[in-house]
From Swiss-Prot:
InterPro entries: AceGlu_kinase-like_sf, Asp/Glu/Uridylate_kinase, Uridylate_kinase, Uridylate_kinase_bac
Organism in which the protein naturally occurs: Nitrobacter winogradskyi (strain ATCC 25391 / DSM 10237 / CIP 104748 / NCIMB 11846 / Nb-255)
Tagged with keyword Lyase: no
UniProt binding sites for UMP: G54, D74, T135, G136, N137, P138, Y139, F140, T141, T142
A Pfam match: AA_kinase
CDD domains per record: AAK_UMPK-PyrH-Ec (cd04254)
EC top class named in words: transferase
The protein, known as: Uridylate kinase
GO biological process: 'de novo' CTP biosynthetic process; UDP biosynthetic process
Binding site for ATP: K12, L13, S14, G15, G55, R59, T162, N163, Y168, D171
Length: 238
């Protein structure tokens, strides 16, 4: 077995991906497959925390034009991430992989409040920790949440799972001449304006010297492949 490149990571999953081929909601085969990938990656000996978006259920930015304030809309979106984390927690537990959802919001009947101490405890117990509720504040994306939580819990990298196998000079689905980058600095990612993550996430990663690996989650086993250094993706690092 190839030795994993990292001891502790945060995996960032988009909520939209959990919908599968559906326009919204949670596609059970998709979330079960992702749970399997995460469990296999954990079996490599890597401590894993996961941040999930909520776009498959609700997008706060979109309702701001319909009379709902941006802070309220963002809060609704953050609550959608709690639902996704609970669904993923259940999928992991069905596979025999212990997991624990921690929320930025106080909701004791639903899941425990996120603290660094709690996250460290559950990671040390071989659980996959699911980080729900975004940052708990409006105007911040779940990409930024992933970098923030990674810095807080001492993760060595953020694994940004997307539907493309890295960062490209332009949209490869529209531009056949688009160039895929093997490696970028945080500053190059910011200056290039690449849409794979928002500027706040890249800026925080640069400040905390945290590597981000952008890869495609479309192929089963891709998370484990990235951890073993055999996967295809773009490394964004200082």
């Amino acid at each position: 077995m190839d030795r994993p490149a990292y001891r502790r990571v945060v995996v960032k999953l988009s909520g939209e991906y959990l919908a599968g081929s559906q326009p919204f909601g949670i596609d059970q085969p998709t979330i079960d497959r992702i749970a399997g990938d995460l469990a296999e990656a954990r079996a490599l000996g890597v401590e894993i925390a996961v941040v999930v978006g909520g776009g498959n259920i609700f997008r706060g930015v979109e309702v701001s034009s319909r009379g709902v304030s941006r802070p309220t809309g963002d809060t609704m979106g953050m609550l959608a991430t709690v639902m996704n984390c609970l669904a993923l927690e259940a999928a992991l537990e069905r596979r025999g992989q212990s997991a624990r959802a921690l929320s930025s919001f106080v909701m004791p009947e639903v899941c425990e409040l996120f603290t660094r101490r709690a996250a460290h405890k559950y990671l040390a117990e071989d659980r996959i920790v699911l980080l729900a509720g975004g940052t708990g504040n409006p105007y911040f994306t779940t990409d930024t949440t992933a970098v923030l939580r990674a810095a807080e819990i001492g993760a060595q990298a953020v694994l940004k799972a997307t539907n493309v196998d890295g960062v490209y000079s332009s949209d490869p689905k529209k531009d056949p001449s688009a160039k895929r980058f093997e490696r970028l600095s945080h500053s190059q990612a910011l200056e290039g304006g690449y849409k794979v993550m928002d500027a706040t996430a890249f800026a925080l990663a640069r400040e905390t010297a945290l590597p981000i690996i952008v890869f495609s989650i479309a192929e089963p086993g891709s998370i484990g492949a990235i951890l073993k250094g055999t996967g295809r993706g773009t490394i964004v690092a200082s």
